């Protein structure tokens, strides 16, 4: 089974991915983790690296290609990433969304940075990604019609969101 888990920065993708991997034994492939590693290797912030990626399509294309290759190597895989639901053939595509204010608080806690900085950097990153994905893929990130399940994660913690997804996966397995 292949599941994609996409969503906005700070929407809870990584936390939910861990819950799903634990319950179903999914191998998790994370685009965000790859992107953060590449940024760190170059000594850049995510905002700086995002601006670089805006002018260098090889960065996104390499991450996408790697995800596609890895997703074919395992029988049960969860592919986590902003574009995963649009670029990976999957049994279920999930999108997590949350208001920016809440996501900034989560990112602030995760990265140990002030909330205002997390807000500004996340907002800048999203503007950059909207432009980048439209330019490279002709994708409108605000169009969620390709997803089977869209969840507002401001209403539940990671376990609550995961329990909703567990039910959807269990029903899919019955079909």
From Swiss-Prot:
GO molecular function, one term: CMP kinase activity
Subcellular location: Cytoplasm
Main location: cytoplasm
Keyword Kinase (UniProt): yes
GO annotation, biological process: pyrimidine nucleotide metabolic process
Keywords linked to the UniProt accession: ATP-binding, Cytoplasm, Kinase, Nucleotide-binding, Transferase
Chain sites annotated for binding ATP: 7-15
EC number of the protein: 2.7.4.25
Keyword Translocase found: no
Pfam families according to UniProt: Cytidylate_kin2 (PF13189)
Lineage top rank: taxon: Archaea
Catalytic activity line of the entry: CMP + ATP = CDP + ADP; dCMP + ATP = dCDP + ADP
GO CC annotation: cytoplasm
Family according to the record: Belongs to the cytidylate kinase family. Type 2 subfamily.
Protein name: Cytidylate kinase
Species: Methanocella arvoryzae (strain DSM 22066 / NBRC 105507 / MRE50)
């Amino acid at each position: 089974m292949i599941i994609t888990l996409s969503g906005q920065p700070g929407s809870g993708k990584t936390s939910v991915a861990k819950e799903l991997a634990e319950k179903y034994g999914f191998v998790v492939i994370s685009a965000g983790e790859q992107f953060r590693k590449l940024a760190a290797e170059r000594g850049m912030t995510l905002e700086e690296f995002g601006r670089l990626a805006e002018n260098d399509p090889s960065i996104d294309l390499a991450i996408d290609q790697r995800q596609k290759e890895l997703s074919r190597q395992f029988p049960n895989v969860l592919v986590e990433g902003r574009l995963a639901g649009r670029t990976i053939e999957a049994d279920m595509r999930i999108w997590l969304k949350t208001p920016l204010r809440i996501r900034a608080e989560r990112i602030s806690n995760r990265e140990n940075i002030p909330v205002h900085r997390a807000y500004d950097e996340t907002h800048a990153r999203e503007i950059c990604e909207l432009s980048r994905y439209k330019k490279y893929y002709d994708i409108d990130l605000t169009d969620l019609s390709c997803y089977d399940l869209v969840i507002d994660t401001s209403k539940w913690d990671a376990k609550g969101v995961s329990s909703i997804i567990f039910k959807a996966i269990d029903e899919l397995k019955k079909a």
